[in-house]
Amino acid sequence: MTTKCPHFQTQQCQSCQWINRPYDEQLNEKQIHLKQQIAPLDQSQLRWSAPFQSRQSGFRNKAKMVVSGAVERPVLGILKDQNAPQSAVDLTDCLLYSAGFKPIFPVLKDFIGRAGLVPYNVAKQKGELKYILLTESGYQGDIMLRFVLRSENKIPLIRRELAKLREKLPQLKVISANIQPQHAAILEGEKEIFFTERQVLEERFNRIPLFIRPQGFFQTNPQVAEGLYGTAQQWVKDLPVNKLWDLFCGVGGFGLHCAKALQEKNPDIELTGIEIAPSAIYCAGLSAQKCGLKKVNFQSLDAANFALNQDENKPDLVIVNPPRRGIGKPLAQFLNQMQPQFILYSSCNAISMTKDLLELTHYQLQKIQLFDMFPHTSHYEVLTLLIKR
């Protein structure tokens, strides 16, 4: 089965480069790629699980819309050419987006006109509204709306029209403006101005509350993310673990899932989560509190620097979920020397993951599974469990 996209057929949008390929073929191609990448590793004790499949449409919980056109007729989508406003493509009917976004787009287009949010013109470096960012929580259908603006000039007008907007769209629970003054291809700036009392969305995966905040990373395919975290939980729940680290922990998805399962058998389990982004650590702390988990410590630090400076308190399990570049040679070598009993490695880049695993000479690859987090593209997530030889 293939997904038919009119924007791809007319070459207006080429983001989903594999969308014309049958889904089974996409999965098979990704599995072959993964097997090719890990070929240099010892697989004598490796157990493969079948790829975790995604829905093929309506799976994406986030919409990042470039705003162009005229204030009375805004276009929400992409610019094929940053310097040519006439190259705008309206993607409000994108097949990837959650159905919850569909009724929102026309109301937002009307709101842009009412509030006088002139779309930013890259070529002329004029205008105010650069992007509209939407994020949906599947837990209660709540939505976060963010306006990315060049300046604070239009903030009073947004406030003036906000009550009408919320009346039409009561599902908008978090609304903010992000100020990005630079004339550069940068999505967001440092300053966030909230128009609502609430500043986070609550999501729930496997009955564990997770929180989404502006400027924080959260997986864009919640169905597959829930499967990924749930699988990690199942893999570790019966392991002899008393202390675990969750490095590059983000909002705490992996660590909280694992700690909750482990603490049900041993309440003295200790979790330390490390992430450089303060907003993510704030969300992770909220989750731990709402879960009622004890002996949990989340810190806003560089994950590699934290690990490399630990002389004592060796963990039994280390979870790593690094960015595409991987954990890097120094951290991989440190873990190899420290020798925790188990390492759970989640990666969005099998090439860098394999480089890291080759440094872990004291470890045996035990389990592996591909998660199709990004359908219709060549990208995927992979989860592996390693045990000390």
UniProtKB/Swiss-Prot annotation:
Primary enzyme class: transferase
Positions annotated as active site in the UniProt record: C348 (nucleophile)
Lipid metabolism recorded as keyword: no
Signal sequence segment: none
One MF annotation (Gene Ontology) recorded for this entry: iron ion binding
Catalysed conversion reaction: uridine(747) in 23S rRNA + S-adenosyl-L-methionine = 5-methyluridine(747) in 23S rRNA + S-adenosyl-L-homocysteine + H(+)
Entry EC no(s): 2.1.1.189
Superkingdom of origin: Bacteria
Binding site for S-adenosyl-L-methionine: Q219, F248, E275, N321
Entry keywords, A to Z: 4Fe-4S, Iron, Iron-sulfur, Metal-binding, Methyltransferase, rRNA processing, S-adenosyl-L-methionine, Transferase
Pfam families, per the entry: tRNA_U5-meth_tr
Matching NCBIfam families: meth_trns_rumB
Protein name (record): 23S rRNA (uracil(747)-C(5))-methyltransferase RlmC
